[in-house]
Each structure stands twice: as C-alpha cells, then as structure tokens.
Amino acid sequence: MTPPDAEDLVASVTCEEAVLLNQGAQDDEGEPLPRLAAIDCGIKYNILRELCRRFEVVWCPASLDFDSIVSEWQPDALFASNGPGDPAHPGDATSARESLAAAVRAEMPVMGICLGHQLMGLAAGLRTYKLRYGHRGANQPVVDLQTGRVNITSQNHGFAVEDPDKGMLAPHPSGARSEIGENALGTDFEVRHINANDRTVEGLDLVGKPAFTIQFHPEACPGPHDASPLFDRFSDMVSEHLADAQRALVRGGER
C-alpha cells in the first residue's frame, strides 16, 4: 500500500482552474476591494468566505505558477491555504511554495495558513517534519510572542516547521523530515507564534516584508474565533501596502 505522505494529496484536492469569485466586490463605502490570489492547496469554504469579505478573490489551483497568476489576474496580494499531506512533497505543494517565494521577492503582501505556513517555512530554508503527536482539535493554545496574548485555536495537522534556534521539537520517532534548504525569500524572518503545549512554531513574520503565516485555522466554524482578527491584520497590511505604492507613484510624478 502506498504511504499517504507519498501521494500528491494537494493535487487531488485543489481546484481545476482559476476562477474570479466575487468580481467587482466593494467595501462599505463603495470602493473596490483589493484583488487577492488565493492558492488552493485544499482550501476550506469558510476561509474563502472570510477572504471574500475583505478582497476580490481569484481562486487559483496550486499548480498555477506565479508569473501566470500575475499576467492573467494582476492580484494585489497572495494567500496560500491549508491542505493535506507532506509540505515537502515534490508535486503541487512545491509549485505553491515557489509561488509564495516569488510573491515575497516581488514585495507582494502574502499570508499563509496551515500548509501555507509550512510552505513558507520551507521557502525560508527551514525544515518541516512529522510531529510525534499531531495537533488536532479546537482547543490548541497559541502564544503571540509579540503581544503575550494566548489564543485558543483550531488545528488539524501532523507536520510542523522547525524552530530556527531549537530545531525540531516533539518529532515523530520515524524521523520523517524534509531536507535542509536555502532561504528563497530574499529576507529574514522571525517566529511570531508558538504552541503553548509543545513550543512548536505556529507562525512566522517576515522582516521588512508585508507577509506572515500562521499554522492554525483562524476561521474555524464551529470552533474558537480568538484568532479571526488575523484576517483583518492581513487586509490592513494589503491596504497599507497599496497606499504606500500610490504615495510613491505620486512622489515620482512630482519630480
């Protein structure tokens, strides 16, 4: 029997072609919402609902490369979803990882959730590995190292991103792990969130870039909504990035 981790599970659950979900979406003041390319690695519908409240969303297959996403859809930001399987699998998960890294290098705002977080970790040069005990359920405590706040989160994953200082925490006896890679992001990163139970990495912030990731599911339904403001954090990040770009354009025209 083929081990589940050997299959390209992302390819089996991603959408078949890119679709614009809510064309012409506007905010409460009638202004157009920013356009977001959401890479589907097995995305949950409630994540799409949360994104569509804040963005005009292009739902993209994981195999669609970054250059094609940009040329065909001209997004303002990029999102990588949750999904099944080994994040280091050489199939569609790797394609999604390459798109994430390219978006970061292009200074595009990026957010990753669950598998998307693990893909960003791999792109940053960190290893991913199988946990001894996967995080399952709606009562996983996560510490925000910047604010000290503890959120109760919903999680369902068996792999984790290694800590850049402490290495692999609570690994599985099988030793399943990815190879050591290089940082393909063009910037450094810092650990923002950790699991309060086993201290494993739960979120990364990229230094000097409008990008961050989280391992948990902020949109869980049913489940805790402590972390749902993270979608607002990303929305604000995108709006600020677009405003900065507009100001730079105006300054350039005045010279």
Task: Map each language-model feature to its residues.
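Catalytic beta-strand/loop cores that center a nucleophilic Ser/Cys/Thr
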Residues: 149-208, 254-255
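Flexible loop residues that form catalytic
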Residues: 83, 209, 219
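Cysteine-nucleophile active-site neighborhood
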Residues: 72, 77, 82-164, 224-233
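Generic structural signal for residues in well-ordered beta-strands
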Residues: 57-59, 128, 191
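RNA-binding accessory domains that recognize and position tRNA/RNA substrates
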Residues: 1-73, 87, 219-223, 233-255
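Active-site-proximal beta-strand elements of phosphoester/diester hydrolases
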Residues: 35-40, 153-154, 212-216
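Proline-centered loop/turn at the N-terminus of a beta-strand
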Residues: 35, 56, 109-111, 127, ...
